[in-house]
């Protein structure tokens, strides 16, 4: 079973279904639920999901909690909570991209594909693909 790490924007497109990227995210998560992929995400990703839902989309806290709980119930999901902050700072120093993205990149286990639409991750030493590139 291939392994993937899902970034914030993949979960948001799946939850919100607000643009053309949502279809690919929905298809990918359907495949994850069916057992085709082993998936990882992190507490930092879920924190970003919560922030965007509350601050950008003005979704009620209770609804955001339900959405995050639904993510946590995803079949074949492992939540990564450990972070190598020194590694993230090194990435941040080298690239000047968002520190949260550097933290996420530092959490991606070796040989695992980071699934994201965020092009900044291509500046970091992680393998990055969009959902469409995996389907």
Residue locations for each model-derived region?
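Short, well-structured N-terminal submotif of metal-dependent ribonuclease cores
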Residues: 1-41, 56-63, 133-135
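Active-site-proximal, substrate-binding regions of enzyme catalytic domains
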Residues: 26, 48-76
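Short amphipathic alpha-helical segments and helix-helix/interface helices
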Residues: 26-29, 68, 104-105, 118
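Acidic, PIN/NYN-like endoribonuclease modules and their adjacent C-terminal/linker elements
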Residues: 1-3, 74, 105-106, 110-135
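Active-site neighborhoods of divalent-metal-dependent phosphate/nucleic-acid chemistry enzymes
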Residues: 76-113, 117
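Alpha-helix capping/helix-boundary segments
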Residues: 10, 45, 84, 103-104, ...
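Alpha-helix N-cap and coil->helix boundary residues
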Residues: 20-24, 40-44, 59, 63-66, ...
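Residues that scaffold the ATP/ADP-binding catalytic core of kinase and kinase-like folds
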Residues: 13-15, 52, 124
